[in-house]
Amino acid sequence: MKTFSAKSHEVKRDWFVVDADNKVLGRLASEIARRLRGKHKPEFTPHVDTGDYIVVVNASKMVVTGNKGLDKKYYRHSGYPGGIYETNFDKMQARFPGRALEKAVKGMLPKGPLGYAMIKKMKIYAGADHPHEAQQPKPLDINVKAAS
């Protein structure tokens, strides 16, 4: 029996919608990354994008456990000497809801052109509404522990 290798034009991609309300950032991000990569499918092939489209709603209601709201730091640099900027999770969630989830998922995907193609299949929205009703996304219940 020959080993099966998926071709990019043969892959069937489904659309799923995930509600991030009261979900923990890291646990949610790891499951989304797994689905974007396609590791849940039997036809998974490491060098082919076999993943599904994921629409995340209520990203502004996502949480972290413990003191990570204040302790978790995000860094960026302007490119100029001394141009480093630092912010924490709470400030980032208030200003850019969903960016923390995007950074977390992006770090869990492969680096390079394949990873860039995978991250484009994730759509994040702060509220409950999204413009992807025409794709008829199926609700995906990710059973992660909610913050207590």
UniProtKB/Swiss-Prot annotation:
Keyword Ribosomal protein: yes
UniProt entry keywords in alphabetical sequence: Ribonucleoprotein, Ribosomal protein
Gene Ontology CC terms: cytosolic large ribosomal subunit
InterPro entries for this protein: Ribosomal_uL13, Ribosomal_uL13_bac-type, Ribosomal_uL13_sf
Ribosomal protein keyword on record: yes
Stored Pfam families: Ribosomal_L13
Protein's organism: Thiobacillus denitrificans (strain ATCC 25259 / T1)
Gene giving rise to this polypeptide: rplM
Domain of life the protein comes from: Bacteria
Protein role: This protein is one of the early assembly proteins of the 50S ribosomal subunit, although it is not seen to bind rRNA by itself. It is important during the early stages of 50S assembly.
Gene Ontology BP term (one): translation
One annotated GO molecular function: mRNA binding
Record protein name field: Large ribosomal subunit protein uL13
Description of how the protein assembles with itself and partners: Part of the 50S ribosomal subunit.
Protein family according to the UniProt entry: Belongs to the universal ribosomal protein uL13 family.
Gene3D superfamilies: Ribosomal protein L13 (3.90.1180.10)
